[in-house]
Every structure is written in structure tokens, then in C-alpha cells.
Swiss-Prot record:
Protein name (Swiss-Prot/TrEMBL): Uncharacterized ORF3 protein
Composition skew (Basic residues), residue ranges: 86-110
Region entry Disordered, spans: 1-47, 78-130
Organism (species): Torque teno mini virus 1 (isolate TLMV-CBD279)
Comp. bias (Polar residues): 13-33
Tree of life domain: Viruses
Biased composition (Basic and acidic residues): 117-130
Amino acid sequence: MTFYSSGEEAQHQWKQLQTQQNKKNSPRPVTSSRDFRSRVQGNQSNTIFTHLTKSAANSQCQLQKDLKKTLQLQHFLQTLEQKTSPSKHKRKRTKYRRTKKSKHHSRKKTTSSSSSSERDSTTGRESESS
């Protein structure tokens, strides 16, 4: 315990009062990241926040209804297009295949004597085989 004279004592008490008042407002050293965050963010009140207000909730419901209608209309359109458009896989097949017409090859004309002998030789062969 220290003893002060009356003037010194008054000054000492006055300094203590000033330091006590300043301690409330004076900065404290930051000891942790949690302490730092609490100082930066400040005091947050414990209020309950709603994500959507009434008007926003109503607009959200309306948007969902419109989305359902749009999806239904798209599905309906696809089914109509499938029914009305000719299908690529449902082509009718012909019953009988068309035969290719054989091309007639023209023979070179040769002398009449040689052509007649060729005809005779071919007919002779045919008659021999039959």
C-alpha cells in the first residue's frame, strides 16, 4: 500500500477513473480468429430470417405451376408431331421385287456368209444336245 499526499491522491484516483472508462472503449488484443471475426462482423441480433416473403413465395408457386403447364404442353406437342409426321421406320414395302431389265447388247454385223455359218453351227449344237 502506498500513501499519497492529498494532491497526488486526487490525481491518482482521477487517472484510475480515466483508465477504467478507457478500458471499456480501448482496443483489446486479438487472441484468436474467433475473436477477430466477432469484432469485424459486429454484434448480430438474433433475428429469424425468412428466405421468401409472401409475395416471393406466391411468385415461386406461380412459377412452378407455369413450369408444369409448359412441360405438359411440350409433351403434348411431341406426341402430336409423332402421330402426324410420317415415320421413317414405317415405310411400306413392295410385295414383289422388280426385276432389272436386261440390256440388249447389239452384236457387230459381220459378213452374211460368216453369220449364217455361225447360226448353223449354234443350231447344230443345240440339236445335237437335245
